[in-house]
């Protein structure tokens, strides 16, 4: 639970003797940082010395205060994973995490310390292979997938209730107008997917990945359809089951604690919201083969998933970043091209409609971050310590920066078979 991660020994301790000279660590990392001259970084070293990298006064400016020499060792050995670990452990600090990550993204191809960088100069990220092996040992097989999901989503329903909106939705919202609340924007997102599916009361919808029941609740209340929803998270299953009973719609929803690979039957429509990232590249064809198997001949499929550029998918597949190690084990972002390839290899589904919501996700994450920090006394009351809080803040704003910079995005995509009369 919350205290278990805090009790884990610092990974730096086991490798601190790999390169004995702290001064050497600093010189190597500083040589890499000095290549990152886009934007502006105000950098304060442990001895109080202030350095300015890039152009002062630049619109993309950030600050980084390095508090302990351990920062340099972490970055030298583990690149951007070590950078995030240094923040969580208090080896460095900043007045704005999002601005700092945005600066790093702006310089992505100028430093070998960051995942996805094409730069091979200097010997940073020396122990990347250890993180990579750790990641490879957690493929999303039936048994491992449950463990990977539980590690993030089973932190406790009470924890997520503190900072999610009343719909209990943990995926990007979709803003129709600037004045909408997060709750309204989440409902807007659900309804956009329902509209893409051309949902009617006669439909039987399969939802792969239940979350806490937000989509199923909206679809049944608004359109009167039936929903079969599957999840492998025990905590989410229990919350959703109680929710459907409370809302008086349990008779319209077949909620299952079931792996998507075990789904049988035929469904008029299929929806899945930000579940595909948890598949890993290895199981993407398996996922689409199952969808192709269960969707009716004239059915529609609506997917919301986080994307990376096609040009970087191979690099992301071969590497591992801080999010994959510390937040979503076993995960991998997908490119639109890779998803289309998987759909084509396993059947005749093809892309009919695509909407990009990248900036909507940046706003969603900022709203979560604001609410999370407003509820810190309650977060601590659940047993989460300051280290966990730093980790969660880094996670939320790391992602917000990535979406705001268009480094990654999120899409709503509708798939169909050829000659579908619903689309005429």
Name what the model sees in each region:
Residues 1-186, 192:
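Feature captures hydrophobic
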Residues 212-223:
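Conserved SAM-binding loop of SAM-dependent methyltransferases across substrates and taxa
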Residues 240-241:
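Conserved SAM-binding loop
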Residues 261-270:
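A short acidic, Gly/Pro-enriched loop at the edge of an enzyme's catalytic core
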Residues 285-297:
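A short glycine-rich, Lys/Arg-flanked "PGG" loop and its adjoining helix->strand segment in the class I
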Residues 307-423:
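Substrate-binding/catalytic lobe of Class I Rossmann-like enzymes that use SAM or dcSAM, i.e.
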């Amino acid at each position: 639970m919350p205290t278990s991660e805090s009790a884990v020994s610092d990974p730096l301790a086991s490798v601190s003797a790999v390169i004995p000279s702290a001064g050497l660590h600093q010189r190597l990392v500083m040589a890499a940082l000095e290549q990152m001259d886009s934007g502006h970084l105000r950098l304060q070293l442990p001895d109080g010395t202030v350095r300015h990298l890039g152009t002062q006064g630049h619109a993309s400016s950030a600050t980084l205060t390095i508090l302990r020499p351990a920062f340099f060792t972490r970055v030298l050995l583990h690149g951007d994973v070590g950078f995030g670990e240094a923040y969580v452990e208090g080896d460095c600090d900043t007045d704005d995490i999002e601005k700092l990550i945005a600066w790093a993204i702006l310089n992505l191809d100028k430093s070998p310390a960051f995942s996805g960088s094409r730069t091979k100069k200097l010997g940073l990220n020396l122990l990347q292979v250890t993180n990579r092996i750790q990641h490879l040992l957690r493929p999303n097989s039936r048994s491992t997938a449950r463990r990977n999901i539980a590690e993030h989503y089973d932190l406790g329903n009470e924890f997520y209730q503190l900072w999610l909106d009343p719909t209990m939705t943990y995926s990007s919202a979709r803003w129709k107008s600037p004045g909408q609340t997060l709750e309204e924007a989440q409902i807007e997102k659900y309804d956009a997917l329902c509209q893409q599916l051309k949902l009617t009361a006669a439909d039987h919808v399969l939802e792969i990945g239940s979350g806490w029941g937000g989509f199923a609740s909206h679809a049944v209340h608004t359109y009167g359809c039936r929903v079969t929803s599957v999840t492998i998270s025990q905590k989410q299953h229990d919350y959703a089951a109680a929710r459907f009973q409370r809302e008086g719609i349990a008779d319209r929803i077949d909620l299952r604690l079931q792996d998507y690979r075990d789904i049988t039957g035929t469904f008029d429509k299929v929806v899945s919201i930000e579940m595909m990232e948890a598949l890993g590249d290895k199981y993407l064809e398996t996922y689409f083969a199952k969808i192709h198997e269960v969707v009716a001949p004239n059915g529609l499929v609506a997917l919301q998933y986080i994307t990376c550029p096609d040009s970087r998918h191979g690099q992301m597949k071969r590497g591992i970043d801080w999010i994959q190690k510390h937040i979503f084990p076993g995960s991998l972002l997908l490119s639109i091209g890779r998803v289309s390839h998987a759909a084509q290899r396993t059947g005749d589904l093809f892309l009919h409609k695509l909407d990009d919501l990248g900036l909507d996700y940046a706003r969603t994450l900022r709203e979560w971050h604001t609410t999370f920090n407003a509820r810190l006394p309650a977060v601590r009351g659940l047993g989460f310590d300051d280290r966990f809080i730093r980790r969660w803040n880094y996670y939320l704003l790391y992602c917000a920066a990535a979406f705001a910079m268009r480094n990654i995005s999120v899409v709503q995509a509708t798939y169909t078979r050829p000659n579908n009369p619903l689309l005429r």
